[in-house]
Amino acid sequence: MADSSERAAFREVLPKQGLLFTEQTPIPVLCKPKIMPMKSVTLEKLETMQREAQEAVKRQEEEQKLQGGMI
């Protein structure tokens, strides 16, 4: 008997007119991982500048050797 009286006390009431609100909890959304470059853009620029400078020095040394050998 106690169960039937408790059920009657907690009767569900749904409105026939008006707004019905529901509570939603945020769910984490998994995104695709972002691929990071192995080297930064500035590091690549520095490496290319260094390579170009080394090549320029080698060219100058070769030109000096050729001119020194001719004289």
UniProtKB/Swiss-Prot annotation:
Describe its function.
Answer: Required for primary cilia assembly.
Which gene is this protein's source? bbip1
Which BP terms from GO are recorded? cilium assembly; receptor localization to non-motile cilium
One Pfam family of this protein, by short name? BBIP10
> What organism does the UniProt record list as the source?
Nematostella vectensis
**One Gene Ontology cellular component:** cytoplasm
Name under which the protein is recorded: BBSome-interacting protein 1
Q: What is its main location?
A: other
Cited InterPro entries:
BBIP10
Keywords, sorted A to Z: Cell projection, Cilium, Cytoplasm
Per the database entry, which stretches of residues form a coiled coil?
none
Similarity-based family? Belongs to the BBIP10 family.
User: According to the lineage, what is the superkingdom?
Assistant: Eukaryota
Instruction: Enumerate the subcellular locations listed in this protein's record, separating them with semicolons.
Output: Cell projection, Cilium; Cytoplasm
